[in-house]
Amino acid sequence: MTNTEINTKTSEFKIIENQKDEPDLKQAQKFVGGMVQGIEFPNGDYMIMNEEGKLMQLPLNPEATALWRATFTKDKYLFGYDDFVVGPAILIKKQALKRWA
């Protein structure tokens, strides 16, 4: 498998499916444009985004937000279900995690 990139007008969303494509810290910082924030999903996948993206008023990332809201639903979580992702984001699939695990 190879990594999949989805480009939008507002931001980028990259899905990493292979360990050889997993970014290191510097690569992740460059992609998201600053300090990184990592969130582990219940299924073991890991999302990396810009920690200060909302403060920087980065544009909404619709693909990452849709994935977030499909995962963290109101019926299962007390908080975070209505949150959103801004700026570039990387989703590292569970089988591709090495450095970030």
Regions found by a protein language model. Give the residues of each.
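Short beta-rich binding modules
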Residues: 1-101
